Swiss-Prot record:
The gene is rpl20. PROSITE patterns: RIBOSOMAL_L20. The keyword rRNA-binding applies. One of its GO terms (biological process) is translation. Keywords: Plastid, Ribonucleoprotein, Ribosomal protein, RNA-binding, rRNA-binding. This is Large ribosomal subunit protein bL20c. One of its GO terms (cellular component) is plastid. Binds directly to 23S ribosomal RNA and is necessary for the in vitro assembly process of the 50S ribosomal subunit. It is not involved in the protein synthesizing functions of that subunit. CDD domains: Ribosomal_L20. It is found in: Plastid. GO terms for molecular function: rRNA binding; structural constituent of ribosome. The keyword Transferase does not apply.
């Protein structure tokens, strides 16, 4: 039976992990075992935080809309209810951008709703 040499396969696998761990501090970028643990943790955190980022932006948009709407005596939930009642389809992101950047058109929108 012939000898199977697969040293480069294992080396390539380890180098791939060490390449992902570049920039980590201390032994986390030098030693394979700690680098592997740190990259797994970093990748899971990045996945989790990509999901959390969406939630955080929705919170920011809602608070911006709520602050802009309260100047006219409404609150966020009644504003959304009136938008739905008048069949105006604007998502939270666009509403918050209008409220932040173009107050005149936002007041026109509020006048149309109220």
């Amino acid at each position: 039976m012939t000898r199977v040499k697969r040293g480069n396969i294992a080396r390539n696998r380890r180098n791939e992990i060490l390449d992902l761990a570049k920039g980590f501090r201390g032994s986390s970028s030098k030693l394979y075992r700690t680098a592997q643990q740190r990259t797994i943790k970093a990748l899971t955190n990045s996945y989790k935080d990509r999901k959390n980022k969406k939630r955080e932006f929705v919170k920011i948009w809602v608070s911006r809309i709520n602050a802009a709407v309260r100047l006219s005596g409404l609150n966020y939930s009644s504003f959304q209810n009136q938008l739905k009642f008048h069949k105006i389809r604007l998502n939270r992101k666009i509403c918050s951008q209008i409220a932040l950047q173009d107050q005149e058109s936002f007041t026109k929108l509020l006048d149309l709703i109220i």
